[in-house]
Every structure is written in structure tokens, then in C-alpha cells.
Regions:
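Soluble extramembrane regions of membrane proteins in the secretory/endomembrane system
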Residues: 15-211
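Hydrophobic cores of alpha-helical transmembrane segments in multi-pass integral membrane proteins
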Residues: 1-10, 44, 52, 210-229
């Protein structure tokens, strides 16, 4: 039993999503470092961590899953930024052909994001989408009146995280969790989180393995209940 636990413990460690040494712009400018992400994780933990929302689906549900929330916000920001740059209007106002074109580019960029020599290169458009997304979280975890009602809905107090730098690092941590949920694990067609959360904008849909294990789990549960009864 201990051997099995040890084996799976090692596998979890080995298969854990990587924390890159740095994220850089196309010109090579350093944007996020490994330490920034760890500082952001610590900042998040000081607010109660998984007692306020969840990350990767683990935590309390009175607030959103921050991974899923960040990912969707960043994707929609990317689409709006690109749509305005190329067509002069928001993504929702484009015709079907234009939307399909942009979604294909979005999917290629996000799912194709990879670590090379400890570094991930981000496009200028993605950086702009990240910055817009980060501002929402910096506002939410502070005392900005613009997000006060949202804080009330999430049972968050004003200045949940009073230090501005801590809020900026928190945003970088949330970004990293979303990056792991969208970037494909090398030599696979699934993200580091096995295509969780569901996000059709970039084809984050359940893998065959997910479906099989979900069915198997239900079967084993019913069988176990039947055995006990």
C-alpha cells in the first residue's frame, strides 16, 4: 500500500505543471518571473486561499474558480483587442467568418504556448489582454468602488489584499494557473490540467480519458454502494 502511495505521489510531482523561470515579451523584455508567481501564490494564501474561490477546481465555491475566471476573461480580452485592431469593432459585433478566423488564431496561440529553456514568449496582444485582466483582479482584491458589488457577491471584504504589489503578484499567480489550463503538455493534445476547465473558445473540452474515468468512477461508486447494501 505504501509503495502504491509512493508511486502515485511521485507521478503527481513529476506530472505537475511547470513554473517557467520567466515569461517575456516578443522583444525579450521580462514580464513575469518564477519568483513573481510564488510571491503571488503566497499572497493568495494570505487571503484564505481556497476558502475564497478555488484554483484548478479545488476550493470553496462562494467565489469563482480563479483559474477558469482568469482564462475566460483573458481570452475574451484578446478577442476584443484583436477584433478592434483588425476590424474596428468588438468581437461580438463581427460576422461568423471573422469570428471563426480569430478563434482559430486564439486557439493556436494559447494551446501552442510552450516553455523553451525555462522561458515562455508572449505576444504583444496577449500581454495587453493579460494587463486588462490583471486590472480587474487588482481592483477586486482592493477597495475600488467599481468592484464593490462584486466583492459583496463573493463574500469578500474591501481591501482583501491591501498591498498593491501583493495584488499585482496575485494576478501573476492567477495568470500562471490559467496558462497551465490552456497550454498543451508536450507531445499531447491536452493542457497541463487535462483540458480543465471547459473553455470552448480554445477547444478545452473533455479528453477521451476524462470521459472514461468519469464513467468508471460512477460505475465503481454504484458497485461500492451495492456491495455495502
Amino acid at each position: 500500500a505504501f509503495s502504491i502511495l509512493g508511486y502515485y505521489g511521485f507521478e503527481v510531482y513529476r506530472e505537475a505543471p511547470p513554473i517557467p523561470q520567466q515569461y517575456v515579451s516578443e522583444s525579450g523584455e521580462k514580464v513575469i518571473t518564477h519568483d513573481d508567481i510564488l510571491h503571488g501564490q503566497t499572497a493568495w494564501q494570505t487571503t484564505g486561499g481556497m476558502q475564497v474561490g478555488s484554483v484548478w477546481g479545488h476550493g470553496a465555491y462562494q467565489a469563482p474558480d480563479w483559474t477558469a475566471d482568469w482564462l475566460h476573461r483573458e481570452l475574451t480580452n484578446w478577442l476584443d483587442i484583436t477584433a478592434n485592431q483588425e476590424f474596428g469593432k468588438n468581437f461580438a459585433d463581427l460576422n461568423d467568418e471573422q469570428q471563426t478566423l480569430l478563434k482559430a488564431r486564439l486557439t493556436k496561440e494559447y494551446r501552442g504556448s510552450k516553455v523553451e529553456n525555462g522561458t515562455v514568449v508572449l505576444s504583444n496582444t496577449r500581454l495587453a489582454a493579460m494587463e486588462k485582466t490583471a486590472q480587474y483582479y487588482i481592483s477586486l482584491y482592493g477597495d475600488d468602488p467599481a468592484t464593490k458589488v462584486t466583492r459583496e457577491h463573493f463574500a469578500m471584504k474591501d481591501n482583501t489584499l491591501p498591498n498593491l504589489q501583493a495584488r499585482k503578484d496575485l494576478a501573476k499567480f492567477f495568470f500562471w494557473t490559467a496558462w497551465t489550463a490552456s497550454a498543451e503538455r508536450p507531445n499531447t493534445h491536452a493542457s497541463y490540467t487535462n483540458n480543465w476547465p471547459h473553455e470552448p473558445l480554445i477547444n478545452n473540452v473533455p479528453t477521451p480519458e476524462n470521459v472514461i474515468w468519469s464513467i468508471a468512477s460512477v460505475v465503481f461508486l454504484i458497485a461500492g454502494i451495492g456491495f455495502v447494501v
